[in-house]
Amino acid sequence: MKAFWRNAALLAVSLLPFSSANALALQAKQYGDFDRYVLALSWQTGFCQSQHDRNRNERDECRLQTETTNKADFLTVHGLWPGLPKSVAARGVDERRWMRFGCATRPIPNLPEARASRMCSSPETGLSLETAAKLSEVMPGAGGRSCLERYEYAKHGACFGFDPDAYFGTMVRLNQEIKESEAGKFLADNYGKTVSRRDFDAAFAKSWGKENVKAVKLTCQGNPAYLTEIQISIKADAINAPLSANSFLPQPHPGNCGKTFVIDKAGY
């Protein structure tokens, strides 16, 4: 099923002229009074290792994972999460509840809850085949039996009325910018090695300035710790522009990776 979904999308791209689907402006049609997005990127080998270590059912994207020539390609898209809108906060909703329930938060937006245990039960996103093909290259859990893109849109996109192509196209673009940055090169160059948080921060600072290191939250699992996710806080009013030193906002916590961690490689 996964292969069919991807192959159909790739065929569609070959039959269509190139368009700027992934360059459509991302604009909230409602609840647009928030100040930031969190770009969540998985270190895919670490994510799969964490699922294995916790005896979770192996996802197709982990079972089929293979080595790649460009190790930066293991930096994949998890999601793009709008911050808490002021209009929702005014109804008594705090950050913790917003991040847990997203668009299903009560009393508003109060959409049907998207559950991680039943991601394929979430509605189809309405993505164009062209954008779906591009997304499948950077979000291994999209389509197939994982349906990550359905879950992410239902939880973090639907209540804002985001155009699905703009929403996921923005993720594709930002993922590419991070992979091509000094931080992306650092991850690729240190594949399978133990690194320091200080050196990672220095790589990020080379691209976007020392003051923006606080925009990054790193998540690790295991002992010794290995990287599973990178979350980057981006100003809402900068989301449609290429990343620059003026794009970021600080996060309240740097994450749990500690002073050193492993850039995990493929395999268990």
UniProtKB/Swiss-Prot annotation:
Q: Pfam family example for this protein?
A: Ribonuclease_T2
- Catalysed reaction equations from the record: RNA containing adenosine-cytidine + H2O = an [RNA fragment]-3'-cytidine-3'-phosphate + a 5'-a hydroxy-adenosine -3'-[RNA fragment]
- The record's EC number reads 4.6.1.21
| Location in or out of the cell | Periplasm; Cytoplasm
Q: So what family is this one in?
A: Belongs to the RNase T2 family.
Q: Which residues form the signal peptide?
A: 1-23
Q: Which InterPro entries match?
A: RNase_T2-like, RNase_T2-like_sf, RNase_T2_His_AS_1, RNase_T2_His_AS_2, RNase_T2_prok
Q: State the organism's lineage.
A: Bacteria, Pseudomonadati, Pseudomonadota, Gammaproteobacteria, Enterobacterales
Output one GO BP term.
RNA catabolic process
Task: State the species of origin.
Answer: Escherichia coli (strain K12)
Provide a Gene Ontology MF annotation, just one: RNA binding
Oligomeric state and interaction partners are given as:
Monomer.
Q: What is this protein called?
A: Ribonuclease I
Q: Which gene is this protein's source?
A: rna
